[in-house]
Amino acid sequence: MRGAERSVKNTAKNVSLIVLVLLLLTLCAANWLIGLNVAQMPADSLLRRAHDQLFGGAVGYELRSSGVAAAEPVQLALTVDGQLYGVQYNVTDMDAAVAAVRDLWAQVLTGEELDPASEEELSAALRAGDCAELRYHGATPLGAVAGWMGGVWKDGSEIYVETLVYAAGSERLFVRTSDGALYAAAAKADKSVLESAQKAFRGLPCKFSGESYAVYPETLLFDSETLSLPLLKNEPIDLFSTRSGTGLEELLQVFGFTAYADFYAEQNDQVRVFIDNVSTLRVSATGLLQYASSAENTTVRAYEEGEVSGQSALDAQMDCARLILDAALRAGETNTHASLYAIGQEDRQTTLVFLQMYGGVPVLGESDFATFAFEDGALVSATVRLQRFDAQDMSRIVLPAKQAAAGAMGEPCGLMVAYREKEGESYVPARFYLKNAD
């Protein structure tokens, strides 16, 4: 009897040892795979497929959407105790406001159908009770906005929105597209969720413009508005300095290069051109980045061809571009951040355009801040223009929205606050009319 017990114990010990050895071998193999330069592996190689199965097929980011927003709202508003309150053009205020209303928008942005709506319908809904507004600059896919807020909007990759308004009184969602068109859908949020958002929301008193001015009815007019912003001046960037940000290593990595990639210098070493068998990365010390590759062999992919489609494919491409931008901004030690502004989709190609933001305010230049072109999920080109700004002691009060609305003429339009270059290298804040192209 005792001999049988000893035999069972010995067998259990042997099995445990075998399992431990197998686990150790697996961990060693996984660690070896992690250490490989997967970016340089052919996509159809056995090692690349093994790495992709264990750690995901994308280089530097996950295939599944991260849920991190690629676009930043510029205005948020919510009715609290019968009074509309809003926040605008401030990163700190905007982050707190988004946290307060996220659950509300998660419920509102769950649907699949939109129908054309009239300005009169929107104006009536704005007067019918509590409302919430979420506004971006540019064209943001409705499905992406829904995902960032925790909702799901079916086929939302096909409509690009600028402003979203939830009218609780009429239980409708209104969306304003980037070209000024207006759509609506039935929407409803739980009373408890709305009340929770109202308790957490903080902002300044404001109201909707309604039908009083030649601007969109949902335009926010703040009471006694004094939006004071500093003048900005360009500061020099040197990406090749040993003291510059995270250095070039991370920047090279997100573009699929190693720290030891071959390069040649131009313009007295003010430009370095990194090359491998399939792609080229041109880096200027002053902050201009230009990447080019062939779709068939690129090492930077948002997803493998045929893996995903629709909103999931768009989400993956936005994540890929956003993470590259994050690495570039760190390398340049800039004090700006990026926000998705426009999307172009044609056949198998997707183009993403990003705004540069300073403290939550867009900075507009002669050229786009960042542009990414994908083909079937493969990054084929990218251009990024890094800048660093110094806030001057002098500030300027931006023209209040109420005065700008009073001066609007013609067809209804939107309003935008942004920095524009003026007088050499100085950037001055101002409020602009957003007219739709005929």
Task: List where the protein language model places each region.
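Beta-strand-connecting loop/turn residues
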Residues: 269, 286-287, 348, 376-378
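Preferential activation on post-signal-peptide N-terminal prodomains/segments
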Residues: 2-5, 16, 20-22, 26-314, ...
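Segments that shape or occlude catalytic/ligand-binding pockets
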Residues: 300-308, 312-364, 383-438
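N-terminal membrane topogenic signal
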Residues: 10-15
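Short small/polar-residue motifs
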Residues: 160, 255-264, 275-280, 332-341, ...
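Short low-polarity hydrophobic stretches
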Residues: 24-29, 320-321, 370-372
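Transition segments tied to proteolytic processing and entry into folded domains
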Residues: 364-386
